[in-house]
């Protein structure tokens, strides 16, 4: 299985769809943090929430783009922020990340117009595909959003017809019976 990582700006998705992120809803914020910590512990994954969240990930996303979004680069950035719980969102924190990663020209890389354009285009393409959250896996124009969809995605990889049953097709056109007033 070839997994291609594509950095996007989550805030761009939220703005487009008119949604709040889970950390912007007070009751959901704590629940989400605790679940992530519990899940990581259960699966032996190093995990520590950074000093503040939500935070602006723009520099880290641009750095990933500038370094071709390899699994190694994304792993390094992800581990720094979420494995070690370090700050990469302040100027000092980002500088420390680039020192530890031995990327002396990071500020020049992330200032590049082409890097900024790629991140913007990635986000616009995600919106065009109908992506509304992260992580999302896109397989043959079929989207699987979130960790809880991993088993469904794996099932789909084994048997793409899992989503073509009569009931699955009916669900794609299910009407609404009520709408909230906003």
What feature does the model see in each segment?
Residues 1-2, 69-72, 76-182:
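C-terminal cap of thioredoxin/glutaredoxin-like
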Residues 1-84, 164-182:
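Structural alpha/beta surface segment adjacent to cysteine/selenocysteine redox centers
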